[in-house]
Amino acid sequence: MPHKVSLSRLKLTDFRNYAAAALALDGRHAVLTGDNGAGKTNLMEAVSLLSPGRGLRRAAYGDITRVGAAGGFSIFAALDGMEGDVEIGTGIETGEETTARKLRINGTTAKTADELTDHLRLLWLTPAMDGLFTGASSDRRRFLDRLVLSLDPAHGRRASDFERAMRSRNKLLDEGRFDPSWLAGIEEQMASLGIAMALARQEMLGLLTRLIEETRETSPFPSASLQLSGFMDGQFSRPSVDLEDDYAAMLAESRYRDAGAGRTLEGPHRADLIVHHREKAMEAERCSTGEQKALLVGLVLAHARLVGNLTGHAPILLLDEIAAHLDEGRRAALFDLIDGLGGQAFMTGTDRAMFSALGDKAQFFTVADGRVFE
């Protein structure tokens, strides 16, 4: 069983609808119940900001600060982390117009948010993700990249560096500045970063596919088959240096076409995650809404197991409205599966009775009017 990473304290100040809130946690799962709009998902969002990025809502930091607050917002958490006990504080200060937040770990200012991954890994599933299989390919790429990040924290930096290089190339092409040596330098950088991104995605899908196959007979959820499409399909068994050379050549050959289109038409930023329901031999986008939800839950929980297996530390799960639309039997099977992962899960719902199968495996909190209490 992997080491259980768990929060013991969570304090919020001027965060969303909370002027101040504090949770004392005992390491069990945390169930947050209350009416719609009470602020349950806001608490989950606060926990999600203990990972790199903008959290489960991907909101601008200025939008997170409580309306009417004099300053910014702050989040404090104490936890038994991957390297032992740790205290994490993050937020923005009064009047800041910023795309970055301040971050302190054990009282010391962190150089980058990537340092958070030394202490915990966070995975989440929210109702906003229910349309993942039928929505835009960019949503599926973002989903896949978060899966990769949980095992390869450098993936985020590679992706942002690739985007930066691609914007530079697009700007040169848009301005008609076809300097061969300048463009070649940028395209070589894009090729190195882009192929590294694609290979990291392929590796994640391979690991996840094997684990899904191994647990297929015991999972209460349908199994997914996964593949990437839209960028150098079927070529990733070749040496990476050859792939980089080919992609750089592809970019060089497509300069005038990309200039006309106003964007780069080939690359990992155009790839798509294709998911099939294995038992039905059907594309996920053609499955019923309920089948899509079950596929997604199974996929996220399989990934959580993979993270625990490979890192030795169970991730913290944020499962928003996870029990909605499941019958009693499937809810009980879901809770058994979550508990069997060995980590701490935060779950939300409107009805406490929906979580009765958890028994004493969970702490129960009521959320109402910007307050949280047991």
Curated annotation (Swiss-Prot):
Matches recorded under InterPro entries: AAA+_ATPase, DNA-binding_RecF, DNA-binding_RecF_CS, P-loop_NTPase, RecF/RecN/SMC_N, RecF_2
| GO molecular function terms attached to this record | ATP binding; ATP hydrolysis activity; single-stranded DNA binding
Pfam families, sorted: SMC_N
SMART domains hit by this protein: AAA (SM00382)
Write out the entry's keywords from A to Z.
ATP-binding, Cytoplasm, DNA damage, DNA repair, DNA replication, DNA-binding, Nucleotide-binding, SOS response
Q: Does the keyword 4Fe-4S apply?
A: no
The biological processes this protein is annotated with in GO are: DNA replication; DNA synthesis involved in DNA repair; double-strand break repair; SOS response
What the entry lists under CDD domains is as follows:
ABC_RecF
Q: Which GO terms describe its cellular component?
A: cytoplasm
Its localization reads: Cytoplasm
Which positions are annotated as binding ATP? G34, D35, N36, G37, A38, G39, K40, T41
Query: What family does this belong to?
Result: Belongs to the RecF family.
Function, as annotated: The RecF protein is involved in DNA metabolism; it is required for DNA replication and normal SOS inducibility. RecF binds preferentially to single-stranded, linear DNA. It also seems to bind ATP.
Q: What is this protein called?
A: DNA replication and repair protein RecF
Which source organism? Rhizobium johnstonii (strain DSM 114642 / LMG 32736 / 3841) (Rhizobium leguminosarum bv. viciae)
Q: What is the lineage of its organism?
A: Bacteria, Pseudomonadati, Pseudomonadota, Alphaproteobacteria, Hyphomicrobiales
